[in-house]
Amino acid sequence: MIINFLLNSIVGTVKLDENPNINLKNNINNNDNNKENSIEINDYLQTLVKEEDFKNQHTDPNFKFLALRSTKVPIDEYNPENYQLKFVQIITRHGRRTPESKRYPLTMWTCNSLDQLITNKDTSRPDCNMGQLTVLGIVDQINVGKAYRNLFINNLHFLDNKYNKDQIFIRSSNRERTISSARSFMHGLYGGSFADDQEKSPNHSSFLILDEKDENMYPRSSPKYNFLKGLLKKHKAVIEENEKSNLKEFTEKIKNIFEDSKFDTAFYVPSWRSYAGLVNSFDCFRNNGLPLPKGFTNDVIQRMYEESAKEFKSARLFPEMSILGIGRFVNDLTKQMYLKSVNDPSVKDLKLSLYSGHDTTLAALLVAYDMYEDNVHPVTSSALEYLLFQDKNYKEPEVVTKSNEKELINHQYVKVIFNHKPIHIGPCKDKEVDGMCPLSEFLKISQSIIPTNYDEQSKITDEEKNKYIQEST
């Protein structure tokens, strides 16, 4: 289905400046070891939200709103000397949210209405829903959108200064937090003053949201996928790593932290199925300024994030999990990339595609392309970018045909950036050109991740189960 959202349909309390340009600045970082041009959002933009807009009687009085990741953009990575940026795909994780659990009273978090991203300060704030974007989650995504505005509009002039619906494609999973994140991103990219008189602005963006049964932006249940996921914890490589890292002792340490202070704070998790789930619940408290049990030191928190990343990465032990889990979404991304590369009329004016997803979306893509380089759980507001470049001096054919298509593709390359840091596709590292994967190789690698027949490949026989068990345990 297509859902239309007004780009300027919110009224402001979190008063980002009426001119979306002046909150941003150019910051040239001349480091002796890395002389690289970077763009950085002004510090005050990140803290401009007023405390009364996100704090309540439950908030830790010492909490300060800070970005969860770096906002420095290495502009040289987007503007290499011999290449022209042709197309950008951005896959984001939603901003800070409330828990998806009835265990905690949702009055602890500060949210806005679902219809308006930012609620007028004179209006009483509505109750939060489970899994809803919080006020700070909205500001996170607005800041991300503003960073891209400064990059793609103010510096590279890649996108039009005024919103052009033909240049941008937007898709979101059918969750409030991802839909609101996409809206917030677009407000940062093309928003205005957020004033009452703009509430019925004719500017709008069409969001593609698939029916639940067709959604593929995150791993879905299937007999084979579920079996392999359950088998991972019993895999000899996973058991060996867990024993080597003393995971059992670390898990007991966290349980003791909860038991020792379960009456001090609302955050209490007696048991958990995965560290990814524990980290997500933990972040709902920490990242929104809510008190935590004593004992969650920086070292403990870092280890939790590492264990979550290890869980995600373990899926590489069964390549079929990437094919079944994220392969259909890879197919959607790759088809769009291919059409743009051969100048298909259907994407003639398209320059940027935004996909608003989840931590499981990003982690699955990082694993599938063997480019999960950081040992950390993808934080909220993370962004994964696929950048399509073309040789600047190449004169492309006026009409693309089957006979010249290969030549055109051979002059194009894909660069991957995660949270403004270049990363590298594992199977393409030895074929890179100037730090980029040739498009022809990228398409081959992508094809290896895409299921040929999802329904058939999702099935698993008892004989296959026994074979997997024998080989992995």
Curated annotation (Swiss-Prot):
Signal peptide residues on this chain, from the entry's feature table: none
Keyword Hydrolase applies: yes
Pfam families xrefs: His_Phos_2
Catalytic activity: a phosphate monoester + H2O = an alcohol + phosphate
InterPro entries, alphabetized: Acid_Pase_AS, His_Pase_clade-2, His_PPase_superfam, Histidine_acid_phosphatase
Coiled-coil positions: none
Gene Ontology molecular function: any one: acid phosphatase activity
Protein name as it appears in the record: Probable acid phosphatase DDB_G0284755
Species annotation: Dictyostelium discoideum
Lineage of source species: Eukaryota, Amoebozoa, Evosea, Eumycetozoa, Dictyostelia
